[in-house]
């Protein structure tokens, strides 16, 4: 048996995201202006931030702050809270003061809450021009208040609340209708000298959403907030968001994202962070490779992979672990990972850096992997092996007209 201890050697990086600060050979990020949401930059080449929204009653300050803490722990950069009532507006000062990440107030219907949110210390306010009463009249005042407070705004256009005139003109919430709504308000903001805003044009349909953002991206340099509205339950919404975001981010479109799921908000953040990690747009953390299992598997791969994932869920080092169930792909995949196991005949071969270091009984595989993985992760962190924070996509996108 090989008695050499691979952990004592400088550890090989595997699959770190490519540093895409250069323009070639991949598609560059779309050029956009930079705005600030509190201390978080959005646009202008800044790292793509992950957002979510609380589902508590905002007026319930302890519950809202608890959920914000959970979102922060999951990797959330910016949080949005709903403000449908006066009680919610009254809760904003304390929430903003105690939140560890920037708070955006989400305002519909009542423009008075916009001004209260600005006064409360919100880092930004989302306004929906489709349902705020007399928005054309109050818009300039909102811009002035935001300018005086030094905060940014988001023009949030949704298919479900599109202005009635635009709906009738374009025959529904088409890409052209959504973009027309966004441009109308963007030009109004800019006409009064306000430029610190980003835009979202959300639709529940993936194809329509992608077409809408492509069209909007060709019209100006505003930072774009990506989202598939009303995406659905966890599995369905995850698929929709990954398809839509993947298509756009691969073309350099998108400056901040929110995965909308009918699920606990922290799940939105986990999906968003992993999506960006896999596209090379966010520092990579722990990742697991596991086979789908088949008739050749001689171990319960599903249970084994789940146990390893759960045991390493809090690891932040960019360690990649392979859990394989047979000898067909097992040794090869395990050798390509930082740490891996190829299982069979009631035992598992443990690989580190492509070398077999030991063979253990099946009932010791999980504990062995967790122990070694934590040792490797600790060394990675001690050696300063942190993943590159990329600024562009890692796949070659399809060019499209107007971009």
From Swiss-Prot:
Ligand binding ([4Fe-4S] cluster): 291, 294, 326, 333
Pathway stated in the Swiss-Prot or TrEMBL entry: Isoprenoid biosynthesis; isopentenyl diphosphate biosynthesis via DXP pathway; isopentenyl diphosphate from 1-deoxy-D-xylulose 5-phosphate: step 5/6
InterPro entries tied to this protein: Dihydropteroate_synth-like_sf, IspG_bac, IspG_bac-typ, NO2/SO3_Rdtase_4Fe4S_sf
Source organism superkingdom: Bacteria
Compositionally biased intervals (Basic and acidic residues): 1-16
Residue segments, region Disordered: 1-31
Named cofactor requirement(s): [4Fe-4S] cluster
GO MF terms held by the record: 4 iron, 4 sulfur cluster binding; 4-hydroxy-3-methylbut-2-en-1-yl diphosphate synthase activity (ferredoxin); 4-hydroxy-3-methylbut-2-enyl-diphosphate synthase activity (flavodoxin); iron ion binding
Gene Ontology biological process: isopentenyl diphosphate biosynthetic process, methylerythritol 4-phosphate pathway; terpenoid biosynthetic process
Coiled coil: none
Name under which the protein is recorded: 4-hydroxy-3-methylbut-2-en-1-yl diphosphate synthase (flavodoxin)
Gene: ispG
């Amino acid at each position: 048996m090989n008695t050499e201890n691979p952990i004592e050697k400088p550890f090989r990086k595997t699959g770190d995201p490519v540093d895409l600060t250069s323009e070639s050979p991949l598609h560059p990020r779309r050029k956009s202006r930079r705005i600030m949401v509190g201390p978080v930059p959005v646009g202008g080449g800044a790292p793509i931030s992950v957002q979510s929204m609380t589902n508590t009653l905002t007026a319930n300050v302890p519950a809202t702050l608890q959920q914000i803490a959970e979102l922060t722990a999951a990797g959330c950069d910016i949080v949005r809270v709903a403000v449908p009532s006066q009680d919610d507006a009254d809760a904003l000062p304390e929430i903003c003061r105690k939140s560890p990440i920037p708070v955006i107030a989400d305002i519909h219907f009542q423009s008075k809450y916009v001004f209260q949110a600005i006064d409360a210390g919100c880092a930004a306010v989302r306004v929906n021009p489709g349902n705020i009463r007399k928005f054309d009249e109050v818009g300039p005042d909102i811009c002035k208040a935001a300018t005086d407070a030094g905060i940014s705004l988001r023009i949030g256009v949704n298919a479900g609340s599109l202005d009635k005139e635009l709906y009738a003109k374009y025959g529904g919430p088409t890409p052209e209708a959504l973009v027309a709504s966004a441009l109308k308000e963007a030009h109004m903001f800019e006409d009064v000298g306000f430029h610190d805003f980003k835009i979202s044009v959300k639709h529940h349909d993936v194809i329509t959403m992608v077409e809408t953002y492509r069209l909007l991206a060709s019209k100006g340099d505003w930072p774009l907030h990506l989202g598939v509205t009303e995406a659905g339950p966890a599995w369905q919404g995850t698929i929709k968001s990954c398809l839509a975001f993947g298509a756009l981010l691969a073309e350099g479109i998108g400056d901040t994202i929110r995965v909308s799921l009918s699920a606990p908000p922290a799940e939105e953040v986990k999906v968003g962070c992993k999506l960006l990690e896999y596209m090379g747009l966010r520092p990579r953390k722990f990742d697991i490779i596991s086979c789908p299992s088949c008739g050749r598997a001689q171990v319960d791969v599903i249970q084994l992979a789940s146990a390893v994932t759960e045991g390493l869920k809090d690891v932040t080092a960019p360690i990649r672990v392979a859990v394989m169930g047979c000898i067909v792909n097992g040794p090869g995949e395990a050798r390509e990972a930082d740490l891996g196991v190829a299982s069979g005949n009631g035992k598992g071969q443990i690989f580190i850096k492509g070398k077999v270091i030991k063979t253990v009984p099946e009932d010791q595989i999980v504990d062995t992997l967790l122990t070694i993985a934590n040792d490797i992760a600790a060394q990675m962190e001690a050696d300063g092996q942190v993943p590159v924070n990329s600024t562009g996509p890692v796949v070659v996108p399809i060019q499209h007209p107007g971009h």
